[in-house]
Design a protein with these regions (language model features):
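Interhelical loop and adjacent transmembrane-helix boundary motif
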Residues: 23-28, 55, 60, 73-80, ...
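Membrane-interfacial helix termini and adjacent extracytoplasmic/periplasmic loops
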Residues: 66, 137-185, 220, 256-260
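Transmembrane alpha-helix signature in integral membrane proteins
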Residues: 79-112
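N-terminal signal-anchor/first transmembrane alpha helix
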Residues: 2-5, 12-50, 119, 123, ...
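Cytoplasmic-entry segments and transmembrane alpha-helices of multi-pass inner-membrane transporters
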Residues: 33, 106-143, 209-210, 223-224, ...
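C-terminal transmembrane helix and the adjacent membrane-cytosol boundary/short C-terminal tail
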Residues: 2-6, 10-13, 198-209, 213, ...
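Short membrane-interfacial helix/loop motifs at transmembrane-helix boundaries
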Residues: 44-81, 89, 147-148, 153, ...
Length: 309
């Protein structure tokens, strides 16, 4: 090396070599998803496809059913049972509104006022789930029985006079009327409304309420401007969890209602298990599914909560 030759420049920091993950590691997430995908495929997708094919069959149980892609079954089912569809949506919608009116104050109480009693109240809310749905509904037959304490109180307060005028009860009785069915639906699905509401309310930062108070907002204004808008995810979730199963319920209509209060779920159950008219039952199921999906879509869009669900 000559005296005038510059020394070699020091080597700079070498960039770390990114190793490509092995094929086995890249497939791990997909293997974890596989059980859930298989479950949905076997117990949701395949039965749905089977029922869809059943709805376009013609024939009878004696002669056998054959897929003929005959959609007249849908038209006949909708024409014959449209009162049951209207009744189902009316009862489910009324029960959902009642669940919201009853559940929101209770969820608010649990989230902000219950204090050390919060866990106990939550246990009481979910306690009905430890009892059979059927037994809980049967209990309402005793509660609403003719001559019972509840009916006597309602008669004394002349509440039944108003509900009879509205067509929700008969003269002096509640059982086997629309009011009995709605009461059963409201009671059975009320926890599905309370729990999502409580979850949303419990996540609200208490400092927002303090800030509203510092700005001289009244409690009513704070609720209208702060609490209720921030609890909309719970309102939407609770509404969906209540309305969707209530619209297809048949237990309450069968046990607490009469032939005049029959819902479409009762018709589907009867067509499947008694009449054995499988195409009509399947068609009714898909019509109900389409109506509920349409109602839910309109509700979500009108409430402006597309990003919350």
């Amino acid at each position: 090396m000559s005296a005038t030759e510059a020394p070699p420049a020091p080597a700079g920091p070498q960039e770390p070599v990114l190793r490509k993950p092995s094929t086995r590691k890249r497939l791990v997430p997909y293997w974890l998803l596989l059980p859930g995908i298989l479950w949905l495929l076997v117990f949701f997708a395949l039965p749905l496809v089977y029922q869809a094919s059943t709805s376009v069959q013609t024939g009878s149980l004696e002669q056998g059913f054959e897929v003929t892609w005959h959609f007249q079954t849908y038209v006949d089912a909708l024409r014959e049972y449209y009162p049951q569809f209207i009744r189902s949506l009316l009862y489910a919608g009324t029960a959902t509104i009642l669940c919201l009116l009853l559940g929101y104050p209770l969820a608010y109480l649990i989230a902000f006022k219950a204090g050390r009693w919060r866990n106990l109240v939550l246990v009481l809310v979910i306690a009905p789930f430890f009892t059979s749905f059927l037994i809980r509904t049967l209990a309402w037959k005793t509660i609403l029985a003719d001559g019972g304490a509840v009916v006597d109180v309602l008669n004394t307060l002349h509440v039944l006079d108003v509900t009879s005028w509205l067509g929700w009860t008969e003269s002096g009785r509640v059982l086997a009327t629309p009011m009995a069915v709605v009461c059963g639906l409201t009671y059975n699905f009320l926890p599905f409304m309370i729990l999502p509401l409580y979850t949303s309310l419990e996540r609200i930062d208490g400092r927002l309420h303090e800030a509203a108070g510092d700005l001289y907002a009244t409690p009513a204004t704070t609720f209208r401007k702060v609490t209720f808008p921030l609890s909309m995810p719970g309102v939407v979730s609770g509404t969906l969890l209540t309305f969707i199963p209530a619209s297809g319920d048949y237990v309450n209509a069968e046990l607490l209602g009469s032939t005049d209060t029959k819902m479409v779920g009762s018709v589907i159950q009867s067509q499947f298990l008694r009449v054995l008219d499988y195409p009509t039952a399947a068609a009714l199921s898909f019509i109900l599914m389409a109506i509920v999906l349409l109602a839910v879509t309109v509700y979500i869009r009108r409430s402006g909560t597309e990003d919350l669900v």
